[in-house]
Design a protein with these regions (language model features):
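Non-catalytic architectural context of zinc metalloproteases
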Residues: 1-64, 77, 121
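Hydrophobic alpha-helical and helix-loop surface patches within well-folded domains
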Residues: 14, 49-248
Length: 248
């Protein structure tokens, strides 16, 4: 598509069920790859679009990470209900139903560091994971950020460890939040704080609830009981609008 131009026009019509938002991307420069993956007995198409500059990273990892994320999240919540999941290489991370935008590029010579690779894998897991929270379990992210970002970051942590049990997860492990929790009390806020008033937004809306859920699963309730309850929450509130009492 980069070799020639056409003056002809074409109309594409897309139809999606049970979505609350949408996005699309178009470029003559994008590389596309895809793979079918079995998610809880259903075939889903995992796809990636990326610029040539991102080829060394995205060609090797992106679509595989998309497929892995769908399987991991589906095992911990409900089966992924959509027919496709798409990762698009971009300047930063953002999520929409069935499509998300993620960062990470190789150097001009095609090499990349472990930090860049792991950052790309982590953001793809996180943004694809947003299909489940808040696109499927449709909480109000403007009112209760932790129900969206916190639960998603917790599932991201589990998916990262299932991808590689030595993955350097930044949010989820208990020891990673110690420095934040040692900060002066006037810089700490309850998780239930309204989204628009949160200071230290990343640690409070992402890391603190993710870490709390991890501790609840590993230390307090145990995996079997926690996993049953977490899956039941997702099942009950799929395509509905839960508030904090519904989770508790």
């Amino acid at each position: 598509s980069m070799q020639g131009k056409s003056s002809a026009t074409k109309t594409w019509v897309f139809d999606a069920q049970n979505v609350r938002d949408f996005a699309w991307v178009s470029s003559r420069r994008l590389v596309w790859d895809a793979m079918a993956t079995n998610v809880e007995g259903k075939k889903v198409m995992a796809m990636s679009y990326y610029g040539p500059e991102a080829y060394p990273l995205y060609n090797r990892y992106s679509t595989k990470v998309v497929a892995h994320t769908l399987k991991s999240y589906s095992a911990h919540t409900i089966p992924y209900p959509y027919p496709v999941a798409i990762s698009v290489e971009a300047a930063n991370g953002m999520e929409y139903p069935m499509i998300c935008f993620n960062y990470g590029r190789a150097e001009k010579d095609g090499t990349y560091s472990e930090t860049v690779k792991n950052g790309m894998i982590g953001v793809i897991i996180h943004e694809v994971g947003h299909n489940f929270f808040p696109m499927i379990v449709n909480s109000d992210e403007r009112q209760w950020s932790w129900m969206d970002e916190g639960l998603n970051t917790f599932c991201q942590f589990m998916a990262e460890q299932e991808w590689d049990n030595n993955f350097p997860s930044n949010r989820g492990p208990a020891h990673k939040i110690v420095d934040y929790m040692k900060m002066p009390k006037n810089q700490l806020e309850p998780i239930m704080t309204n989204s628009e008033n949160i200071i230290q937004f990343g640690p409070n809306a992402y890391a603190k609830p993710a870490t709390a859920l991890n501790i609840l699963r590993e230390t307090i309730m145990g995996r079997e009981l926690f996993d049953f309850a977490f899956k039941e929450y997702a099942r009950r509130w799929a395509f509905k609008h839960p508030t904090p009492p519904d989770l508790f």
